Amino acid sequence: MGDIVLSARAITKRFTEGRLDVTVLQGVDLDVRAGETLAIVGASGSGKSTLLHLMGGLDAPTSGSVFLHGQDLAHQSAAAQGRLRNQYLGFVYQFHHLLPEFSALDNVAMPLWIRRLAPAESTHTATEMLAKVGLQERLAHRPSELSGGERQRVAIARALVTRPACVLADEPTGNLDRSTANGVFELMLELARVQGTAFVMVTHDESLAERCSRRIRLVQGRLLEAF
């Protein structure tokens, strides 16, 4: 089993507005290890996406701590959190969130530009990653010129181009037909194996979850492991 790359300790999340006071997550503990594929399942409203956002440092827990590569995110400035996310995490969503005016190649190179890599190196690395996801012939195509499955593969390539320790994926196949979803999911499993990247995936699809190396279920904000 690989080293722990991301962990949550006693995570609780409450949302309050006026008289409304809802506890979405209650005392969640979770470790994510290098190279594992972890599925988070549960009913709508069980806190799956909220947990993913907290683990990614996109929101702060009401109480508890999130550790990314051993660093407590609560003790980091917003700028430091951003640097940690860019260094260690990748994100994939149900909707690809690609920039429509940019080519597939430029979308994938974007995280490398943010890291201030040289343009030639960024282009070379992004081209290699797109080849790994089978899109070496689609480098110059914009998102509107790609199929749904191709757009999601570009999004996966973008998430992986910096070789992150962990990719957080929120319903990454939820907007795809069954055949395309299977292809995208197999790609994620293969890249986890080859690159040693951990994948944490929120999904409603139990059949896909069963193919992950580990599964957890959220029930009324509490975590049930190894079902």
Curated annotation (Swiss-Prot):
Membrane topology (UniProt): Peripheral membrane protein
Protein family according to the UniProt entry: Belongs to the ABC transporter superfamily. Lipoprotein translocase (TC 3.A.1.125) family.
Protein species of origin: Albidiferax ferrireducens (strain ATCC BAA-621 / DSM 15236 / T118) (Rhodoferax ferrireducens)
Name recorded for this polypeptide: Lipoprotein-releasing system ATP-binding protein LolD
Function noted in UniProt: Part of the ABC transporter complex LolCDE involved in the translocation of mature outer membrane-directed lipoproteins, from the inner membrane to the periplasmic chaperone, LolA. Responsible for the formation of the LolA-lipoprotein complex in an ATP-dependent manner.
Keyword Membrane: yes
E.C. numbers: 7.6.2.-
Gene giving rise to this polypeptide: lolD
InterPro entries named in the record: AAA+_ATPase (IPR003593), ABC_transporter-like_ATP-bd (IPR003439), ABC_transporter-like_CS (IPR017871), ABC_transpr_LolD-like (IPR015854), LolD_lipo_ATP-bd (IPR011924), MacB-like_ATP-bd (IPR017911), P-loop_NTPase (IPR027417)
Subunit structure comment from the entry: The complex is composed of two ATP-binding proteins (LolD) and two transmembrane proteins (LolC and LolE).
GO molecular function, one term: transmembrane transporter activity
Main location: membrane
SMART domains: AAA
Gene3D superfamilies noted in UniProt: P-loop containing nucleotide triphosphate hydrolases
